[in-house]
Amino acid sequence: MSQSQNAIFTSPTGEENLMNSNHRDSESITDVCSNEDLPEVELVSLLEEQLPQYRLKVDTLFLYENQDWTQSPHQRQHASDALSPVLAEETFRYMILGTDRVEQMTKTYNDIDMVTHLLAERDRDLELAARIGQALLKRNHVLSEQNESLEEQLGQAFDQVNQLQHELCKKDELLRIVSIASEESETDSSCSTPLRFNESFSLSQGLLQLEMLQEKLKELEEENMALRSKACHIKTETVTYEEKEQQLVSDCVKELRETNAQMSRMTEELSGKSDELIRYQEELSSLLSQIVDLQHKLKEHVIEKEELKLHLQASKDAQRQLTMELHELQDRNMECLGMLHESQEEIKELRSRSGPTAHLYFSQSYGAFTGESLAAEIEGTMRKKLSLDEESSLFKQKAQQKRVFDTVRIANDTRGRSISFPALLPIPGSNRSSVIMTAKPFESGLQQTEDKSLLNQGSSSEEVAGSSQKMGQPGPSGDSDLATALHRLSLRRQNYLSEKQFFAEEWQRKIQVLADQKEGVSGCVTPTESLASLCTTQSEITDLSSASCLRGFMPEKLQIVKPLEGSQTLYHWQQLAQPNLGTILDPRPGVITKGFTQLPGDAIYHISDLEEDEEEGITFQVQQPLEVEEKLSTSKPVTGIFLPPITSAGGPVTVATANPGKCLSCTNSTFTFTTCRILHPSDITQVTPSSGFPSLSCGSSGSSSSNTAVNSPALSYRLSIGESITNRRDSTTTFSSTMSLAKLLQERGISAKVYHSPISENPLQPLPKSLAIPSTPPNSPSHSPCPSPLPFEPRVHLSENFLASRPAETFLQEMYGLRPSRNPPDVGQLKMNLVDRLKRLGIARVVKNPGAQENGRCQEAEIGPQKPDSAVYLNSGSSLLGGLRRNQSLPVIMGSFAAPVCTSSPKMGVLKED
């Protein structure tokens, strides 16, 4: 820094002394700041121990050590050699700007007054020196410019002097030539004789040459001026041309630059346009694809709309047709009520004629059983009672009557509680637990050891059902369906009319069979055998509260809700309702009495005390004559009135008798259950066989592993649709106990149409020896658990099991392509006789004689009513097994959309009665 100042301040104008004095002042200031031995600085340092040694931030950044102002004299001599005006100017500008930084630094360290004062003085000196140096720099710059201009003028003067010297040399040479020529001429003239004449002539001649030379000189000068002017003109033109060329070049460069910029801009615009075009193309392609999809969806929606229109129209037609069918069924209901009243009047007249001593009081609304069949049954029972020990039988009768009256008292209390709050019917397909009752078939020609082994197998499986249900225990949920069950029993009245002809034929056939028997029967028998001997191929099924279905036929004190099995129930009726036995030994038409002949083998029965709420049940084992067994094993396949032939995967199955729905001695057990819903009347009526067809296995989540899955015809289809509406129907189930029979059936969705199954078209094959006893569920006491359920053949028209009526089935036929399987009803056939009307309702059929039956079996297999086999299901909320018949011939009435769900089934125990 001092070098630049010395270089600038040393000038020939005499300003060096001033700058040296200023430099000394700045040195003094710097020395004060850099001297560490000053007392003021020591005082401040002692007062403030934490204050560090003073050092400017600017000095720290730019390595300022306070030595730039104190330079030695030997360095000042060579300062002007390495300094330039630009460096000096930038240095002074830095010093001027340094004052602002010092002020900022002063604000930071304002707690030291002495240092602040010294720094302010230093700043003022530095600013003054910087301003003086800046002024001197400006003056030096002006002087340097003047020096350059003078040097340029000096060069021009040197050029002019050289030019003048050149011209002077030329003129001297020309004068020398002229002088030489003149001297030669003078020498020539002096040699002539006339001297004076020659001298005058030479003088004149020289003057003439001088004039000529002067003229030539002038011409040369003029020519020189012209050439100079021309050269100047050419020079000016050249300059102008150069300027024009330079301007043209600059213009071209400018235009080229503008063109390049425009080209780059247009390139960018083109790239943007191309990107936009690509984006538009993508959007266009996406829009085109969306248009195609929307057109496709539009077509689908149009097709769906047309289908929905068709379905809506079909549903409207179905609704109208359902309304018409409803009115038609109401008319048929009124007609059935009229028939019922007529039949009741006839029954009343027959009772008044038959026996004045009979005191069984039936209700006018329900005349299901006649006095003839009941009296005949009691007659057979009493004949068997003659061979028993009188004292033991009376003791047992008293104990049984005591249990019955206790049961009546409990049932009356339960009924009073359940009338005001009727329970809702559990719907199959829901998750509620339900009790499934299946038939327990067995053949009569088995050996005694085989019977015992089967009983042991049944006893081993009894413990599973003991924890799930107490048999015979009354409850409000079971008694809530009493009115519905009583209305179902009214169908027995209609079925009874179709059984009269069959009883006469069966009487003759039974007598013929018993006449061929050779062996006698040893041992004691009980009244229970009166029913078991007539139904040798039947199976006993125990309902939780099957006796409660008889309430409508007895006085209040005789209404039994506990299950009373077989002839034991008739025994109680005999003791309580008919004390007068004057006409008990009279023969009754249509009733078979077993007391007049011996049976081929001992009949053993086991009964458990159901009235004491035990967990076990009743089991009967009856042997059949060998001749009848051989006939049955070689009989041809037939099709019953209500039972269709079924061909299982395990092998062919044979129906044992020509009319299994009407047999007494060799018939299949048929039990009736009804699933009631608030739907339109259904056209589905099914008969459940027990031994002629493969039985179903009932699975339970709470039972042992011996239970298998249910495999029922039309189950999968009914489960898929019936379960989907379970919740809705649970909330809409109602109960009515005061309406008429037809109205209640219509409310519950019950009708008596015959279900036609295409499977009956296949002929039946004989049953092999290994299948003497049909497969029964694992919980049946009469047979061991099945290794696997026998599969059923698929049904073609599965929708008939859940359709409410034919128009709804037609609606589903349009949707799923189902073929119709029923013909529309003929309204013109309403006014017929009683048998034709019953046949039209699908409840009973006219039974042919045995000879005609044997000839018409093939025709019945083709054109007869086709019924699918099924198991008997009883909901847990029901208090009775609706429709349990003595003759096991009433068809099963299935509710529409009834999707049964198997859970647990109580097992029937085996207890020997001492």
From Swiss-Prot:
Gene Ontology terms: biological process: dendrite morphogenesis; dendritic transport of mitochondrion; endosome to lysosome transport; mitochondrion distribution; negative regulation of axonogenesis; neurogenesis; protein O-linked glycosylation; protein targeting
The protein's name: Trafficking kinesin-binding protein 2
Gene symbol of the encoding locus: TRAK2
SMART domains linked to this entry: HAP1_N (SM01424), Milton (SM01423)
InterPro entries registered for this protein in UniProt: HAP1_N, Intracell_Traff-Reg, TRAK1/2_C
Keyword field: Coiled coil, Cytoplasm, Endosome, Glycoprotein, Mitochondrion, Phosphoprotein, Transport
Subunit and partners: Interacts with GABA-A receptor and O-GlcNAc transferase. Interacts with HGS. Interacts with RHOT1/Miro-1 and RHOT2/Miro-2.
Disordered: annotated segments: 1-30, 447-482, 765-787
Chain spans, region Interaction with HGS: 359-509
Localisation: Cytoplasm; Early endosome; Mitochondrion
Annotated tissue distribution: Widely expressed, with highest expression in heart.
Modified residues (Phosphoserine): 420
